[in-house]
Amino acid sequence: QAEGYRLGLISNAGDTPDVYVLLRKAHLTDFFERIWVSADIGYRKPHRRIFEPALTYFDLPPARMAMIGDLLGADILGAHNAGMSGIWITRRAQTPENERDRHKIVPEASIASLAELPPLLRTWPQQR
């Protein structure tokens, strides 16, 4: 946010209050302008429709938005289904789901941790 980026959270959680509890415990609630939970929307990532409220809210073309997530088959494929870029956090790269999808779903960028995100985003317009 300090660098001018607007942040929203899209979660596949089945229980909306649980998402807020976890965010409060991690002191992350204030980082996000809006939070969308599949339990409320009725669709889960990778379905493109879970991204539609965020696209409407931020009022930007999908090509100007990116999904940052650690699951290729949900987060990155979902971003692509919605016309967005996908940035893969590789901390869970060895999970069976990610191993299965590694050769089929290609993110626009990969980072090992969220600490790498600000430098990546500073150069993002030049990379796209």
Model-derived segments and spans:
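Asp-based, Mg2+/Mn2+-dependent phosphohydrolase catalytic module
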Residues: 5-6, 10-128
